[in-house]
Amino acid sequence: MPNVTLIGIDLGKNSFHIHCQEKHGNTLLRKRFSRIQLTQFLATCPPCIVAMESCAGAHFMARHISQLGHQVKLISPQFVRPFVKSNKNDFIDAEAICEATSRPSMHFVTPRTEDQQAMSALHRVRDALVRERVKATNQMHAFLLEFGISMPRGIAVIKRLATVPEEHELPPYLVRLLTRLHQHYGYLCEQIEEIERELKNHLADDETAQRLLTIPGIGTITASLLATKLGDGKNYLSSRDFGASTGLVPRQYSTGGKSTLMGISKRGDKNLRRLLVQCARVYMQRLEYQSGRLAEWVNGQLTRHHSNVVACALANKLARIAWVVTTQGTVFSK
């Protein structure tokens, strides 16, 4: 097909549905392929734009198709949905991807590298292990409370668990259960520490992450995740765009010429947003030891707004600073 200029692909686990268009938007081909057949088809096509939704497997396919000489564009599924016509099927989805791609104002997702995907997987596994560790601690608290034993909040139950059977009469099966939970807690701690060591080792060889560590309040985990999400930062036109992508800006609902700002939009990566807010709170807790324009700005905001509002505003500012540090290759300066 020498006239094809745009190919929309609806990705699947084993099957791929394509919709091919020429420069005027007329349909040239609709066909279903397997993974191998799709590669063979794209290898014989002239260089063109290949568009896909940024879903599972999209970043790998983007890298693979780019090696075949095509220009790959990834679109967030939420921007494709308005272009779906009538009933939904795989071919209509592929056509909707083509329609969305042809819009001049459409926002696209930059394909991730293999290293970025691997680091993102490490962060997701660590986050899951941390949640599992909290769950194990809460279970031990709850089981002891059912037998009238109230323990302090946090990991104190772990430190005092060995003395609990000696101080209180408990059924043998409960003691064995608590022992298993304690062992599981220790296993989770070991896994989390191992992943954090891998992140620190990778961080030592990443120049961008090292520059991000110069930002006050930013630690190892946050710097690693920021470096993974930002890449070279060129996917965002400005620091304002990156701040908005983290969901740390007010949600707008305006009509009739009246502008209404609501709570933060909470878009994007929830884990990154949570870490940035934690970094902001750490900075605010040690505000008396901070100096420079950022500290003066935070002090001024605290005189006018609640500390929770200031924490979100500071988290947004830290995200914008991270974009500048990444794109300009500089370090943070007070």
Curated annotation (Swiss-Prot):
One of its GO terms (biological process) is DNA transposition. Coiled coil: none annotated. InterPro entries: Transp_IS110-like_N (IPR002525), Transpos_IS110 (IPR047650), Transposase_20 (IPR003346). Keywords: DNA recombination, DNA-binding, Transposable element, Transposition. The keyword DNA-binding applies. GO terms for molecular function: DNA binding; transposase activity. It comes from the Bacteria. Required for the transposition of the insertion element. NCBIfam families: transpos_IS110 (NF033542). Belongs to the transposase IS1111A/IS1328/IS1533 family. This is Transposase for insertion sequence element IS1328.
